[in-house]
Amino acid sequence: MALARVVSFEGVSKERMEELAREMREGDRPEDVPATEVVMLHDPEAEKSVVILFFETEDDYRRGDEVLSAMPADDTPGRRTSVTKYDVPIRMTP
């Protein structure tokens, strides 16, 4: 079963989110993070963000979690407020 790493952030400005989105589109993703998909959600009025990373195996999740947990604060969207691991029993696209 796939796993998801769901991270919440505060203090995420619209400008910071635009900068991160541009970096991700240009291929500037964290190395050694074997995520199969990344979803970034942003509430610009509340300056909050949620980042969801999907992993296919427990080993991939562990590797990604180690790298992302060690990431400098300047490389994250804002102040990290929570990190939660979820099983992904259903994942659908149209």
Tell what function each PLM region has.
Residues 1-50, 56-70, 76-94:
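Short S/T/G/P-rich N-terminal loop/turn motif that feeds into the first structured element of a domain
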